[in-house]
Curated annotation (Swiss-Prot):
Record organism: Halothermothrix orenii (strain H 168 / OCM 544 / DSM 9562)
Protein name, entry field: Acetyl-coenzyme A carboxylase carboxyl transferase subunit beta
EC number(s) per entry: 2.1.3.15
Cofactor binding comment, as recorded: Binds 1 zinc ion per subunit.
Domain CoA carboxyltransferase N-terminal residues, every copy: 32-292
GO BP annotations listed: fatty acid biosynthetic process; malonyl-CoA biosynthetic process
Length: 292
């Protein structure tokens, strides 16, 4: 049974569709306006999209799809996807799992909760992986773990810096221990990347939690958090119910983690691409000066 874990899909045959930011409707579908979840401001959708899905009044960052994230991060036309042939199977024959995967494939136009590929950012080559919370809450199952691992291995073999945008609700319960195993698997791969001397920049977006936080997302050489992102292992509601104590203001938000030394910087969505380019430029200068 396990030998077929990364085989061709035996159950779901929904054809993958190209899913770009230009084709995707703004939040609210056919509506012209969106209400900000934080300040309740009514925002014209066109204005919201032009502002990279950030509320112009309070700065609240709406969640992005993986392809929208790619579109605002990498150089246009530079993306070469790999790993799209890895299909989700149902190793535990969990009731309803095949149907749920099929539903999310149709809903998101994606095969899984992550996209991996090679691209450039301001001309600097990278291996990039972007998770998508819209696909089963960004949960990490065996395919997500395998694609992250292959992205790491691609970075090692090509000696290109690795950039991973994380957003996840935790391990995928429908795959049981096989999903939990991905924490150790991806962490071991990051260790090999580290030994090879390859730069790894981890970007945590809202929300990043569970097994993803406890593995590769927290192992970057440089860890960037998007402004206002929830970053946690167990969420604040679970912790509050467990210890019956009122939590500090902003607990587990990006800014709180920065104050406590858990991330290196907190950036708005508008700043991330430029900051990545600066990091890559400095890294390239360092490699050249060392004869790399």
């Amino acid at each position: 049974m396990l030998k077929d874990l990364f085989g061709k899909s035996r159950y779901v045959t929904v054809k993958r569709e190209e899913h770009t930011s230009s084709k995707k409707k703004a939040p609210g579908d056919d509506r012209l306006w969106t209400k900000c979840k934080k300040c309740k401001e009514i925002i014209f959708n066109k204005k919201l999209v032009e502002n990279l899905m950030v509320c112009p009044k309070c700065g609240y960052h709406f969640r992005l799809t993986a392809r929208d994230r790619l579109a605002i991060t990498i150089d246009e036309g530079s993306f070469k996807e790999f790993g799209q042939d890895i299909k989700t199977v149902d190793p535990l024959e969990f009731p309803g799992y095949q149907q749920k995967i099929g539903k999310y494939k149709v809903k998101t136009g994606m095969e899984e909760a992550i996209i991996t590929g090679e691209a450039t950012i301001e001309g600097y080559p990278v291996v990039i992986a972007v998770m998508d919370f819209h696909f089963m809450g960004g949960s990490m199952g065996s395919v997500v773990g395998e694609k992250v691992t292959r992205a790491i291995e691609k970075a090692i073999s090509t000696r290109k810096p690795l950039v991973i945008f994380s957003t996840a609700g935790g391990a995928r319960m429908q795959e049981g221990m096989l999903s939990l195993m991905q924490m150790a698997k991806t962490s071991a791969a990051i260790k090999r990347l580290n030994k090879a001397g390859i730069l790894y920049v981890s970007v945590m977006t809202d929300p990043t939690s569970g097994g993803v936080t406890a593995s590769f997302a927290s192992l970057g050489d440089i860890i960037i958090a998007e402004k206002g992102a929830l970053i946690a292992f167990a969420g604040p509601r679970v912790i509050k119910q467990t210890i019956s104590t009122k939590l500090p203001e902003g607990f587990q938000r990006a800014e709180f983690l920065l104050d406590h030394g858990m991330v290196d910087m907190v950036l708005s969505r508008h700043e991330i691409r430029d900051e990545l380019a600066k990091i890559l430029k400095i890294h390239q200068i360092g490699v050249v000066s060392n004869g790399g």
